[in-house]
Design a protein with these regions (language model features):
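Membrane-interface helix termini and inter-helical loops of multi-pass transporters
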Residues: 6-13, 93-103, 163-166
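Short aromatic-rich membrane-water interface segments that cap or initiate transmembrane helices
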Residues: 8-25, 62-69, 101-113
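Juxtamembrane inter-helical linkers in multi-pass membrane proteins
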Residues: 46-62
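Alpha-helical transmembrane segments and their membrane-interface junctions
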Residues: 75-93
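Interfacial loop-to-transmembrane junctions
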Residues: 127-149
């Protein structure tokens, strides 16, 4: 009986939209992390007045900061869409009490909880940039921290702790 539900879930049009939007969000966050780390390395090089090969081949700090915040904004948008689609999709499924995977799709599922935590982190990052004027190193560090949480959601939580997202 569980295989029937699994097949229905994987064949749902909501599945493709949910997964693709979340993967695009996580890819955007990965790009933001790389840009953030690049920003931090370039900042360190400039502060030490050691302008080597690394400096000559990179855009300015201002452009890196701009690229970082844009990657975060795009990722946040797709993360929001993916989470909303997941909620709508779950609410439309007619859950029979026999499938524990469907029963586990609540906020108590570690993967869902951490995905919402990622949304809070990146929401704060966008808020801090727009309302509090945070730029540069602060945003770069937040991008790096946020992506570390994304990786946490994929590796240990995705493989060992969640039950509803294992297909």
């Amino acid at each position: 009986l569980g295989d029937v539900y699994k097949r229905q879930i994987l064949e749902s049009p909501w599945f493709a939209l949910h997964v693709s939007s979340l993967l695009f969000a996580y890819a955007s966050f990965a790009i933001a992390c790389v840009i953030g780390i690049t920003y931090l390395l370039l900042f360190k090089e400039l502060k030490a007045k050691h302008l080597g090969v690394f400096y000559a081949r990179l855009p300015s700090l201002h452009i890196l900061d701009y690229m970082n915040t844009r990657a975060i904004a795009v990722g946040w948008l797709f993360l929001t869409v993916g989470l909303i689609v997941g909620v709508v999709w779950t609410s439309q499924e007619h859950v029979d009490g026999t499938d524990p995977r469907m029963q586990a799709m609540t906020l108590l599922d570690p993967k869902i909880f951490v995905a919402l935590f990622c949304w809070v982190i990146y929401s704060f990052e966008l808020y801090a940039h727009r309302a509090m004027g945070w730029t540069g190193r602060r945003i770069a560090w937040l991008s790096t921290f946020g992506f570390a949480i994304v990786l946490l959601n994929f590796v240990p939580i995705g493989y060992f702790l969640t039950s509803s997202h294992n297909f």
